[in-house]
Amino acid sequence: MSDYKHTLNLPETDFPMRGMLPKREPGRVSQWQDMNLYQRLRDARAGREVFVLHDGPPYANGSIHIGHAVNKILKDIVVKSKSLAGYDAPYVPGWDCHGLPIEHKVETTHGKHLEADEARGLCREYAGAQIEGQKTDFVRLGVVGDWENPYRTMDFANEAGEIRALAKMVEGGYVFKGLKPVNWCFDCGSALAEAEVEYADKKSDAIDVAFAAAEPEALASAFGLASLDKPAAIVIWTTTPWTIPANQALNVHPDFTYALVDTGELLLVLAEELVESCLTRYGLEGDVVATAAGASLEFITFRHPFYERVAPVYLADYVTVEEGSTGIVHSAPSYGLDDFMTCREHGMSFDDMLNPVQGNGVYRDDLPLFGGQMIWKANPHIVDTLREVNALMAHTPITHSYMHCWRHKTPVIYRATAQWFVGMDREDDQGRTLRQRALDGVEATQFIPAWGKARLHSMIANRPDWCISRQRNWGVPIPFFMHKQTGEWHPRTVELMEDVARRVEAEGIDAWFRLDARELLGDEADQYDKVTDTLDVWFDSGTTHRHVMRGSHPMGHDQGPRADLYLEGSDQHRGWFHSSLLTGCAIDGHAPYKALLTHGFTVDEKGRKMSKSMGNVIAPQQVMDKLGADILRLWVASTDYSGEMAVSDEILKRTADVYRRIRNTSRFLLANLNGFAPERDAVAFEDMLALDQWVVDRAAQLQARIQGAYAEYRFRDVYQQVHDFCAHELGGFYLDVIKDRQYTTQADSRSRRSCQTALYHVVEALVRWVAPILSFTAEEIYEVIPGTRGDSVLLEEYYPHLATLEANAAMGREFWSRVLTVKQAVNKCLEDARNAKVVRNSLAAEVTLYADDSLRETLTQLGEELRFVLLTSEVHLASLEDAGSAQAEASELEGLKVAVVSSPHAKCERCWHHRADVGTHAADPNLCGRCLSNLPEGPGETRRYA
């Protein structure tokens, strides 16, 4: 038997079958850095329409987790897809650098007794080191951005910009002084920063207190009962009896289940999970008569145990069901931050908040029962009073870890004190409030997914004033001078703030803390107090639309500070989206963004949150080291980001399987471009074979859909379209059909060059489609495509050379759609024949298609070449009426029956078709006549269609 391998055009490529991504990707990152890809992109798109995705800054503390990876990959896909569409799409990554977590890290390492300026220096140093670590991982993910020039909220220019933004809001009349609970030391007589608080053991009275139902009918209804047959009460647990006189609400978790427990003489409301432990503590027995979700208890009122007032139930996410508690929290808003925020969110004004504890720890004299008593000494009196009114369910002295002043080693409480706020309902000079402007901003914003609009609208509509001050050391200062007698701002406050901003721009925030007031106020200095508060870190990031986009990193956007897109996790409706909206509306009168895209949180394959204790944490660093960043990127693109995003080792393994399909398809395309030079060998669309025209037309249609999907941030659709194209239209049809023509026709024949031209157009388009997602692999593919290449696929735009079929083409879209349907039906019949051992494979088969007139007319157009489409050695067409006398099977296609028989002819050793003329040619009895003509010295085969 002769070896005909050398006469075939077998596939050959340098593109490897195995990705070996963990090994190859770091080299690609280095290549991008060496070529300064980000700047090359800026230069290539200069003068084009600008698209700005403004980066919400992650906190500069700790290693990145899978949520960070999801966020940065989604942003990178957006930016790269916009660049692919021809936009100038800058991406400036940022970091949030101030705040308590970094202060704590520095204190843990260096101790709490640092001088303030030394502590700030160490915080700055720590944040810088954390940024470098996170940046390394983000770059390794394949995220392209201005990594050499990111924005950092601790950069002097941004710290100064923040002060200028605050000045604008002061000028607009939005900033005022109000109340908020802070750490308070009676011995210091002042508020304490978190850094000035330490924890030590303290003996306390743990008490369970019953609040009698004031609305038994409403309580019965909440539990699905017609009425209550005995008195009812809700039970709270606390270790601070001294706060009971200031109680104003009761908090339950909206998602917890609460039980109504019959103890004989009294019905008790307790968290269902804690019923058994609570009854044991009370020395009672009881039965659960009904249950209800916490949300159904909202606004039902209960009577204060010893004062003539009621406390409503509010919903609060911070409520827990830890052992020893009841699942209900008593709320004294002046003495707990969570209590304060919950009551403010439910509309309680500052004036309505009870604040009977004075700065020295003594109740005001006008407090009934306990006026004039020091709170620690009042505790046993309060316990006795609760016992006397039959409201004390349990009393247990405990020793627990509690806040103490680091100077005096004495207990500290939360106490409402004066803080700085941004007012939501103060009218500006146009008679509009910030709340109204912000709600208008919500309405003017596009939300992806759409449900985000209602969520943010509700938050803005119901939120309290924004407390922007913190008693922190590591933060941007609130540079106010307040008159000692009147409490009023200095009349030149805005002017003075600009002076401070210039100093901060040169020296950083230390410029304010070191400042002697006389430098700015002269002889007036003695009349004014210098404010030492710092700004909430949400104000830091919430004003980046101003001090980054219009300050440190101007992005050339035609609409100033209004970004095209903010993209963050769903928690940012309450966070960055929220603070940015408020500052944007206060400063510029509109939202700082046109659209908000929200993604869900990552969970495991069972929908559980990730935690080290459960062992279900997926670390992006480990995924990159084991599978490669492109697998992580493909998983992100393939997942519906609008909800929870499930990830696990098994899910990533399935993602890797899809990746291999795309990679192998690309490899087949490249391998069959062996010997093809597009400048020399490309065939004009009108001269291509009909099947090749069809696949180019399909690619053109697909590209239009992919462009639309990218434009609308439907990355999962892009993934599905590409995967389906590779798996079905290419892998399941076109690539199978063209193998015979590609391998067996003469190397330079029109038939082969037509096919190669189609493959070339398809791979040129495909590599661009996947580049925003599979950036590493796309570069690898791009480098191997024949023809003139640029330096990076990421510098390219959508492939412009995909021709389309005429609407009235004889072999147009409808024609090939019918042919494809026939092929699928015939494939099923061939599979049945193989299973029945009628034939070994499709090329060993001859088929007769009994088709109705319409179908037969379609198939007749392909003539002799129909067998190449069906991958059989022979095809006969007959009328459907003739099927009755033949052993034909009904196919899955109406109007078609198929008869499959084993070919009686010998197999050609070169093309493997079974043909009647094999053995009849003296020149080579092992070959069919077609293969003889396709040998290099032969005249060549002519194909017209397939």
UniProtKB/Swiss-Prot annotation:
Enzyme Commission number(s): 6.1.1.5
Motif 'HIGH' region: where in chain: 58-68
Domain of life the protein comes from: Bacteria
UniProt short sequence motif 'KMSKS' region, positions renumbered to this chain: 609-613
Residues reported in the UniProt entry to bind ATP: 612
Residues the record lists as binding L-isoleucyl-5'-AMP: 568
Primary location group: cytoplasm
Note describing how the cofactor binds: Binds 1 zinc ion per subunit.
GO MF term (any one): ATP binding
Subcellular location: Cytoplasm
Enzyme class: ligase
Cofactor entry: Zn(2+)
One annotated Gene Ontology cellular component of this protein: cytosol
Keyword terms: Aminoacyl-tRNA synthetase, ATP-binding, Cytoplasm, Ligase, Metal-binding, Nucleotide-binding, Protein biosynthesis, Zinc
Catalyzed reactions: tRNA(Ile) + L-isoleucine + ATP = L-isoleucyl-tRNA(Ile) + AMP + diphosphate
InterPro entries xref list: aa-tRNA-synth_I_CS (IPR001412), aa-tRNA-synth_Ia (IPR002300), Anticodon_Ile_BEm (IPR033708), Ile-tRNA-ligase (IPR002301), Ile-tRNA-ligase_type1 (IPR023585), Ile-tRNA_ligase (IPR050081), M/V/L/I-tRNA-synth_anticd-bd (IPR013155), Rossmann-like_a/b/a_fold (IPR014729)
Binding site for Zn(2+): 908, 911, 928, 931
GO annotation terms (biological process): isoleucyl-tRNA aminoacylation
Pfam family, one: tRNA-synt_1
Cited CDD domains: Anticodon_Ia_Ile_BEm, IleRS_core
Domain notes: IleRS has two distinct active sites: one for aminoacylation and one for editing. The misactivated valine is translocated from the active site to the editing site, which sterically excludes the correctly activated isoleucine. The single editing site contains two valyl binding pockets, one specific for each substrate (Val-AMP or Val-tRNA(Ile)).
Function, in words: Catalyzes the attachment of isoleucine to tRNA(Ile). As IleRS can inadvertently accommodate and process structurally similar amino acids such as valine, to avoid such errors it has two additional distinct tRNA(Ile)-dependent editing activities. One activity is designated as 'pretransfer' editing and involves the hydrolysis of activated Val-AMP. The other activity is designated 'posttransfer' editing and involves deacylation of mischarged Val-tRNA(Ile).
Protein family membership: Belongs to the class-I aminoacyl-tRNA synthetase family. IleS type 1 subfamily.
UniProt subunit comment: Monomer.
Protein name as it appears in the record: Isoleucine--tRNA ligase
Native organism: Chromohalobacter salexigens (strain ATCC BAA-138 / DSM 3043 / CIP 106854 / NCIMB 13768 / 1H11)
